[in-house]
Amino acid sequence: MVYLAVGIAGMIGALVRYGLGLVVPAAAVGGFPLGTLFINWTGSFLLSWFTVMFTRRPAWPPWLKTAVTTGFVGSYTTFSTLSVECVELMEQGRFGMAAVYIAASLFGGLLASWAGYAAAQPERKEGIG
């Protein structure tokens, strides 16, 4: 069951990534790989959010967590494309842009992950008076 769920979720994640890559082409922003950056940032957010949600809901089946985190989010995000795009930028002599891309990917991903974690926390109500 878990293999099928991971496969189906992985297919969906890959298709969503492909579709977003078509919507945000790199050429539209001076060759900066904004599409991959956006995908990896949102994937970092989603992985943290889902991780917290599954931890807080132990009744949810374990296969669902694996399908969502490893299948969907794992196929949606892409470290290999990040790496290839950095190499391509460096081969074009755009070392500064490659460095910005690496830094934005790392620090933006960490920030997005923190935001996903924070967004999944229970809402805290302030007392009156």
From Swiss-Prot:
Membrane topology, from the record: Multi-pass membrane protein
Keywords on record: Cell membrane, Ion channel, Ion transport, Membrane, Metal-binding, Sodium, Transmembrane, Transmembrane helix, Transport
Swiss-Prot/TrEMBL catalytic activity: fluoride(in) = fluoride(out)
GO biological process: cellular detoxification of fluoride
One of the record's GO molecular function terms: metal ion binding
Known regulation of activity: Na(+) is not transported, but it plays an essential structural role and its presence is essential for fluoride channel function.
Annotated S-S bridges: none
UniProt superkingdom: Bacteria
Record's subcellular location: Cell membrane
UniProt keyword annotation of Metal-binding present: yes
A single Gene Ontology CC term: plasma membrane
Annotated positions binding Na(+): G74, T77
TM regions (residue ranges): 19-39, 95-115
Role played: Fluoride-specific ion channel. Important for reducing fluoride concentration in the cell, thus reducing its toxicity.
The family this protein is said to belong to: Belongs to the fluoride channel Fluc/FEX (TC 1.A.43) family.
Name of protein: Fluoride-specific ion channel FluC 2
